[in-house]
Amino acid sequence: HQGVAGILNLIQDLRKRNFTKSFTFNSSARYALITKLAGIKERYQYPLFEKKKQNIIETARKFIYVHLNKTVESNPILNIDENKVLETKKKYKFDKEYCHILLGLGGSGPTKRVPVEKFIKFMDLISTNKKCKFYLAAGKNPIEQEIINKVINSNHNANCLSLGFMDISETLPIIKNCNLAVSNDTSFSHISAALGVNTIVLMTDTPLLYGNYSTKMTPVLPEGKTNVTHDSLGKEKINPEEIYIKAKKILNL
């Protein structure tokens, strides 16, 4: 639904569903226009043009409380079928001999993708403490598939499994079975934390709050930085040694 054609398609899709009420967790005038033209009578949305002033957690909590009279915590939980988790554990041999680590290698843009060499260096370091298996998560686009291929072609290829072309229904129980996640600030960091997996989030170019709102999240910042935000451009300064130190602490290695 990108561009003018995408907007028109989205309006058409919404009209077909005859929604009577909408809640828009965004300050964009584009979404305000879309929901109006879709014929939705009751439209609730964040205040327009106030994105820079917003705390993503508190703004959402207040919005939900005001319009739905519900109090929500900032520690989201994603529940999946326990039988599916156990089946996956058996299918992919999640045994205790190994430490099972999800690597969130992708990102919504190039400034959020920490160079893959830094992930490989972390893999080298953590593998000196315990045998590890790595589960490689990224998008299906050619750029991110190339990143996955670089990891698979490293010295760790025998202990890697790509999740790149799996359905989400197959991916979630795999992530749930992991002992740790190390991820760029991408959807996989939010998913793994919500599944209850301790997650190290590599913060390079977005507000720190995106990577520490959950008790399951441990942020790693660019060297020399005590905070990050939009346009911090810190991906080259993420230190694999720091990831390793925090991973050892979380895993009690």
Predicted region positions:
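Catalytic machinery of carbohydrate-active enzymes
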Residues: 1-253
